[in-house]
Amino acid sequence: MRRRTTTLVTLVAAAVAAGIAVPALAATSSSGVPTAGPADTPGSGQSVIDWNRQLISILGAPNVQPGTVHPTRSFAMLQAAEYNAVVSITHASPPYRSAVPAPGDARPDAAADQAAHDVLVALYPSMRDGLDTQLNGELAGIPDGQAKQDGVGVGAAAARQLIALRSSDGSSAPPAAFVAGTGPGDYRPTPPKFPAPMYTGWGSVTPFLLDNAKQFGLPAPPPVSGAAYAAALNEVKSLGRDSSTTRTQDETVAGKFWSATPVWTTWNQVAQQLVADRHASLRQATDVFAALDLSLADTTIAMYDAKYQEHVWRPVTAIQLGATAGNPDIVGDPTWNPLTPTAADPSDPGAHSALSEAAATALTAFYGNHQPVAITATADPGVTRSFDGLAAAADEAGLSRIWAGQHTRIDHQAGQQLGGQVARLVLGDLHQPTTG
């Protein structure tokens, strides 16, 4: 049973300093899930958290990267490089793609720090000074000697490998041309500003672990002329309107809450606190973040492939043009507007549903589904959303898009199916345990 509460909170100091709105999470240990034991690899998981936070800070800096899904690639590259740097030395888990040569006495913590630094410098060269400062601080805590030097060399090699692997992945290709449809159900730019469709080519980016973006084909969405679609659309029409009288106050808060921050940032913040709460070792932390961010990156690629393959119109279009749907159970309302602005891409599958299910599936493999979480956002007013487990948080993230007028329940269910499938594949490839 899901438990949700809303409380006023203080802005997170780190987020204010960075000038960005990011969530934080307070996790309560569950007696049913074992806590991390003593570090089995030199170093702690804190350095992995530090580099993850650094990337979030970079993404919040002005003019570093426009609003885009590119950060899912950046998170995956960062975490895969740290992961490979560690497992190339410890051989504790299968490498991502392939290991790099590593002396047996090399320090894994030095390797992880160097790998993280080098990947982020390659992605965001204008941030080198701050990244150099962070690297020097992390390495200063590691005893000098040959093992440290060897670790630095392994980390640099792991970063070079990751950068080379992703150098021609299609992420920098010009957006693919998209011709908007005019028939019932066809996606087209949405009111009020009618922006051009975004991320039209992201489904063609080379996945990190999927064989291809279509590996998990979703069932075709139901026709807009059918009863199933009408029922789903009418739910959004009632609950998702800006002036809805059927949406509860708590649902309104949730709809705005999950719209305020990129969902991949939210789930990385969740992972940060789970790792910190369990005092995870370096190896444990790199395992967790690699599973999370490789899942998010490949889900994003597969999701955009599906979105532009199906090109389903958004609820705001369907409702305002309802008379053109050819469905007697859909009554148009040209005055209808959603609670939050509509994203400039097709509706099915839902992004929050897909990405949150992927994240929850990955994290549940390590922490179980009985880990209470309380996610805090710095949007005005600041609120905390509390849940009995990761699955409940993911479920609300997806349903919030119905309450915000962004997606139908059909989109939500398709997204959940896709995100779960991708995350389970990633966990299998990294030989991490799966649950459920």
Predicted regions and their residues:
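Acidic/polar surface patches and capping/hinge elements
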Residues: 27, 33-436
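Secretory targeting and sorting signals
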Residues: 1-29
